[in-house]
Amino acid sequence: MKKIRKKELYREGEPRITPREMRDKGVKYVLDKIKRQPGYYVTNTERDLSQSDFKNRIMPHTQLLVAEERNQAGFFSLEITGGASVHVDMLRKQINPLEKLQVLGERMPDTMFQTLCRGINLFGYRPYPDNVIRMTVRTFARYVHVWRVFDFLNHIPNMVPVFEEVKAAGCILEPSICFSTGPEHTDAYYVRKVGEILDVTGEDILLCIKNHGGLGTSKRIGDLVRAIHDRYPDLVIHYHGHNTDGEDIGRIVAAVLNGAKIVDASDHAFTGFYGPPPLLSVVDILADYGYQAAGLDRQAVIETSNKLRPER
């Protein structure tokens, strides 16, 4: 495969955040930069879109096709691995998920890669031994910069081994609270869970509100972001949702208006029914509220979808 020349797009003082910046200046510097930046950042959740709407059928060929445009786009991160994608890479596509990350990383040197990890279930469907968890995290941490970690019951001890290894690797740790709408899922419940996470991790983390069910109203999400922000004002909140009910753009807007600094969306040419909402719709609506996407190159986002559309 022909190697393309790496092109460093980052310049000192720009709002975008690069892997080099994280390596050279550390996680705390990155978190402080996010807090100082007006507006909000966008994560492109291609992995979740691929899993939710295409059964992880998006191939490395397609990812390489738009690598240059995505690298130019200025996303906070690109979720490109994790969840069910690792086993699909190995068992169905018959590719090495680590080699995929290495090749894509060479073509996207200015973009942080993100993964979704299921705590002690890692990228699988059952609990794994402690040594397997730690070895796996160390191995993937060579290529992955942002680690979103969750336990679907919000049982914090199930995430601790991953927390420890991500921190030790110098990567950005993003513990999650999984959102639901039962009578017990109050603001007080979630604020308490955030406290349990911080007791383990300290405050040098991102916190994800993980609304993978696409539940709740925009007001409900806004109230939750505000409750967490009021209790922990220095915490950087990252909202993740699905557009299954068609309402997630409203929830994203409410999250940003109430203090979230990073939100998830996907390339508009690939969005469908169950994944995150279309990126440009999110950006345009928030712009009408006076919030700009930090570091985002709109033309690169458009060119990405122009290339992706025939691949759908």
Regions found by a protein language model. Give the residues of each.
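Catalytic cores and adjacent flexible loops of soluble metabolic enzymes
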Residues: 1-148, 152-312
